[in-house]
């Protein structure tokens, strides 16, 4: 579970979260903003997607996000990513593209203003081998959002804070400064390495280049295959 400010910048995440999930959630939320601009979100909405090309991961990693309002003002977003036991598709290691791997859920509102979208629910469950298990996972996220929203609003009330704008800015500035300080300790230069894997059809090579310059670091994987069969 992660907490983003009203701009979609992640400021809090569970210490037990997968690093890959922590990193992809803000990117997925930015994609959601293209489909649903921030002004179109309403209290009780939940937006869902598992489209890996938008940042979620592979198809079994489902991202959902809900807005948090204080009065009429949008103050935050709460999101989570969960790995569903089944997402449809052919149970075969011979899958060559995402269409064979399972169902891609486009960005859509699975809950509108607190009411489950029965059409989206039916579309999902009718394409799954374990619909009850997956639907249980989805509704567990709904419950987590309600609890997180309740606790967030309670903290704001207790501390006399209207929104997260100032707090989010301070947290992000401190995080940025801390990371830049850690980078400055490293010698400037360009560092390259590669690892070789057995692969599935043929051996694979993953290449990585790291450029350090002052308080900046750039990482690229030039020379690594973009799409592979695993």
Question: Residues of each region from the PLM?
Answer:
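Mobile "lid/hinge" segments at catalytic clefts and subdomain interfaces of large enzymes
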Residues: 74-152
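Conserved mixed alpha/beta core segments that line enzyme active sites in large multi-domain catalysts
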Residues: 9, 13, 25-67, 192-196, ...
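A short, hydrophobic, proline-anchored segment that marks a local hinge/packing element in signaling
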Residues: 61-71, 79, 211
């Amino acid at each position: 579970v992660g907490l983003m400010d009203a701009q979609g910048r992640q400021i809090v995440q569970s210490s037990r979260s997968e690093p890959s999930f922590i990193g992809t959630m803000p990117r997925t939320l930015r994609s959601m903003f293209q489909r649903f601009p921030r002004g179109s979100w309403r209290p009780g909405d939940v937006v869902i997607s598992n489209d890996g090309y938008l940042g979620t991961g592979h198809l079994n990693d489902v991202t959902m996000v809900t807005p948090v309002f204080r009065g009429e003002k949008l103050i935050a977003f709460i999101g989570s990513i969960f790995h569903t036991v089944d997402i449809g598709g052919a149970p075969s290691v011979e899958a060559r593209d995402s269409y064979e791997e399972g169902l891609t859920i486009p960005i859509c509102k699975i809950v509108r203003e607190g009411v489950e979208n029965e059409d989206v629910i039916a579309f999902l469950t009718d394409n799954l081998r374990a619909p009850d298990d997956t639907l249980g996972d989805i509704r567990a996220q709904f419950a987590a959002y309600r609890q997180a929203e309740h606790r967030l609003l309670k903290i704001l009330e207790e501390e006399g804070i209207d929104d997260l704008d100032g707090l989010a800015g301070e947290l992000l500035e401190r995080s940025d400064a801390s990371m830049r300080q850690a980078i400055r300790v490293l010698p400037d230069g360009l560092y390259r390495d590669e690892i070789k894997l057995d692969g599935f059809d043929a051996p694979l090579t993953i290449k990585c280049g790291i450029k350090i310059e002052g308080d900046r670091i750039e990482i690229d994987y030039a020379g690594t295959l973009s799409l592979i069969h695993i």
